[in-house]
Amino acid sequence: MAPNLRKSHPLLKMINNSLIDLPTPSNISAWWNFGSLLGICLTTQILTGLLLAAHYTADTTLAFSSVAHTCRNVQHGWLIRNLHANGASFFFICIYMHVGRGLYYGSYLYKETWNTGVILLLTLMATAFVGYVLPWGQMSFWGATVITNLFSAIPYIGQTIVEWAWGGFSVDNPTLTRFFTLHFLLPFMIMGLTLIHLTFLHESGSNNPLGIVSNCDKIPFHPYFSLKDILGFMLMFLPLMTLALFSPNLLGDPENFAPANPLVTPPHIKPEWYFLFAYAILRSIPNKLGGVLALAASMLVLFLAPLLHKSKQRTMTFRPLSQLLFWTLTANLLILTWVGSQPVEHPFMIIGQLASLTYFTILLILFPLTGALENKMLNY
């Protein structure tokens, strides 16, 4: 019998082992769809981004008008831009769901996969931040100024780092050109990290909703999960296209319709919606360095997830107390997101401070305590 090419060819063999003959737990739910959705998001963003980069000019005098030119004069330029801008929002929705799934089902116990995933999240956040600066609107400019300026809180070397990052004494042309360079480079870095992430995942195989070893009950990825993933793609592309075609500016900031002006500060500087929770944590501490540390900690705390797992059970499927905490954390993040979009005044300040405190308390204290308590209740 002739050898099967997809199983013997050096390149096809890798694809086959990752996407076709991959042994997959038979009981993984729709929460396991977000990995492939993130892959399709990344591909879409890179394709639309390349098309936009072909018409973009990374110069302070031309950036704003080059984006307007793309939308007005380039064939379907408006659609490409709207897909790229709103595609970023869907990218973040998917990654937050993906991380949430990992926390709920104890996927973080695959330490290498989890750690590369957290690095991917941080890289994605950096990419989105530098990308937001490129249209050179008011919020782009002031967002860049405020966030890069946070590095000046680092003792002794802070100011030097900021001026080095800016390429001058304020956000200006050198800043824009290097941000464009970074925004072009980072997605390819994300692609590389994704391959590392998948390599580590395929070492252990997927987790499943029961959190038990599923080697005795695995099915091939294709056709079962390839079909399920395609359904996921369609269910994501439908709202993305709806948003991009019917209300493309719904999630954007109206300030960004005005070209960047260093002499006029917008009344309320705020990032895109997907960074608002972190922005609320940053603002909730009335000290610059403290705020920066809290902001960093809000993301880096994810690295500690494997160390804070005290339960004998892997997932939260049969742990009602931990479930209650998990959904409280979810609600808390939504509150932080809302507070981040509000002005810095009473009562939003105190709500933000309480929500920030709750965020860290749940993750660092209550999750491990509850895990230990549930062990006790089950006489483990």
Curated annotation (Swiss-Prot):
GO cellular component, one term: mitochondrial inner membrane
BP terms from Gene Ontology: mitochondrial electron transport, ubiquinol to cytochrome c
Chain ranges passing through the membrane: 34-54, 78-99, 114-134, 179-199, 227-247, 289-309, 321-341, 348-368
Keyword terms of this UniProt record: Electron transport, Heme, Iron, Membrane, Metal-binding, Mitochondrion, Mitochondrion inner membrane, Respiratory chain, Transmembrane, Transmembrane helix, Transport, Ubiquinone
InterPro entries cross-referenced by the UniProt entry: Cyt_b/b6_C (IPR005798), Cyt_b/b6_C_sf (IPR036150), Cyt_b/b6_N (IPR005797), Cytb/b6-like_sf (IPR027387), Cytochrome_b (IPR030689), Cytochrome_b_C_euk/bac (IPR048260), Cytochrome_b_N_euk/bac (IPR048259), Di-haem_cyt_TM (IPR016174)
Binding, heme b b562: 84, 183
Co-factor binding details: Binds 2 heme b groups non-covalently.
Record: residues binding a ubiquinone: 202
Any Pfam family hit: Cytochrome_B
Functional description taken from the UniProt entry: Component of the ubiquinol-cytochrome c reductase complex (complex III or cytochrome b-c1 complex) that is part of the mitochondrial respiratory chain. The b-c1 complex mediates electron transfer from ubiquinol to cytochrome c. Contributes to the generation of a proton gradient across the mitochondrial membrane that is then used for ATP synthesis.
Summary of subunit composition and partner proteins: The cytochrome bc1 complex contains 11 subunits: 3 respiratory subunits (MT-CYB, CYC1 and UQCRFS1), 2 core proteins (UQCRC1 and UQCRC2) and 6 low-molecular weight proteins (UQCRH/QCR6, UQCRB/QCR7, UQCRQ/QCR8, UQCR10/QCR9, UQCR11/QCR10 and a cleavage product of UQCRFS1). This cytochrome bc1 complex then forms a dimer.
Note: Heme 1 (or BL or b562) is low-potential and absorbs at about 562 nm, and heme 2 (or BH or b566) is high-potential and absorbs at about 566 nm.
Protein's UniProt name: Cytochrome b
Organism (species): Balearica pavonina (Black crowned-crane)
Lineage: Eukaryota, Metazoa, Chordata, Craniata, Vertebrata
